From Swiss-Prot:
EC number: 1.14.17.4
Enzyme class name: oxidoreductase
PROSITE patterns for the chain: FE2OG_OXY (PS51471)
Name of the featured protein: 1-aminocyclopropane-1-carboxylate oxidase 3
Lineage, opening ranks: Eukaryota, Viridiplantae, Streptophyta, Embryophyta, Tracheophyta
Residue span(s) of domain Fe2OG dioxygenase: 153-253
Length: 320
């Protein structure tokens, strides 16, 4: 079996740059996922985020989750549960306006650490988007501009904990789905596994690795690249032992950003018989549709957007 792609970003600064860019290209085209090491976020920052996230779960969320499980009788289920996930979560919004001050139960140190971590992740996400531009033959900044809308991108972090589950064969930690947005940066537990992606009909484990950042591509990048890069189904398998920590940070288009295939990429494929044309739509409209269809196939979402394409009035962005 092929090895899960692990990319050392430091190698972009030396003689191995071309080979590293090729690895990123291959990961985007054939996996939709890759794992970054030497990504520039200090290990001590990540260690502090992990310590505070796990402490916050123990102090503020663990008991709440146990009460939820008891109230729904989940420990005694006999058949597969298809309408909920075995996870305890909260969401931090960073852009365009942060909600970190308003989220209840966070202590001041945790708020400050997460603000700093978010800034570092935002910078890394934008660096990655430019690397994708380079590999795609798009001008530098194209993807950031495509995501911008009138108020800049949406950026936020879903903080999740996946506690031990008595019936992991019947309840998923998180059901299979593709991500709706742009580019996703995941800081995951390095001891408790569970994340899997679907490749060539097989579920493949995403290996836990200390101080790494897992990257995956969302539906919007599939549209903008005209299918050259694809979002990939992934899920979290609940475990009988250990609580898995996951901080998934979503760098998404602004709500009013108009998303459509980059013209230069459509032109490059004009000679191909199987040219697939993706729709043009406002990102917020896609998200409203996704909210009810997250755990279903993405293709009907694209078709639904295509049916409403005539309503999209906004002009294309001025690059390409």
């Amino acid at each position: 079996m092929e090895n899960f792609p692990i990319i050392n970003l430091e190698k972009l600064n030396g003689s191995e740059r071309d080979a590293t860019m090729e690895m990123i290209k291959d990961a985007c085209e054939n996996w939709g996922f890759f794992e970054l090491v030497n990504h520039g976020i200090p290990h001590e920052v990540m260690d502090t985020v992990e310590k505070l996230t796990k402490g916050h779960y123990k102090k503020c969320m663990e008991q709440r989750f146990k009460e939820l499980v008891a109230s729904k009788g989940l420990e005694a289920v006999q058949a597969e549960v298809t309408d909920l996930d075995w996870e305890s979560t909260f969401f931090l919004r960073h852009l365009p306006v942060s909600n970190i001050s308003e989220v209840p139960d966070l202590d001041d140190e945790y708020r400050e650490v997460m603000r700093d971590f978010a800034k570092r992740l935002e910078k890394l996400a934008e660096e990655l988007l430019d690397l994708l531009c380079e590999n795609l033959g798009l001008e530098k900044g194209y993807l950031k501009k495509a995501f911008y809308g009138s108020k800049g991108p949406n950026f936020g972090t879903k903080v999740s904990n996946y506690p031990p589950c008595p019936k992991p064969d019947l309840i998923k930690g998180l059901r299979a789905h593709t991500d709706a947005g742009g580019i996703i940066l995941l800081f995951q537990d390095d001891k408790v596994s569970g994340l899997q992606l679907l490749k060539d009909g097989q579920w493949i484990d995403v290996p836990p690795m200390r101080h790494s950042i897992v990257v995956n591509l969302g539906d919007q990048l599939e549209v903008i690249t005209n299918g050259k890069y694809k979002s990939v189904l992934h899920r979290v398998i609940a475990q009988t032992d250990g609580t898995r920590m996951s901080l998934a940070s979503f760098y998404n288009p602004g709500s009013d950003a108009v998303i459509y295939p980059a013209p230069t990429l459509v032109e490059k494929e004009a000679d191909q018989e199987c040219k697939q044309v993706y729709p043009k739509f406002v990102f917020d409209d896609y998200m409203k549709l996704y909210a009810g269809l997250k755990f279903q196939a993405k293709e009907p979402r694209f078709e639904a957007m295509k049916a409403r394409e005539a309503d999209v009035k906004s002009d294309p962005i001025a690059t390409a």
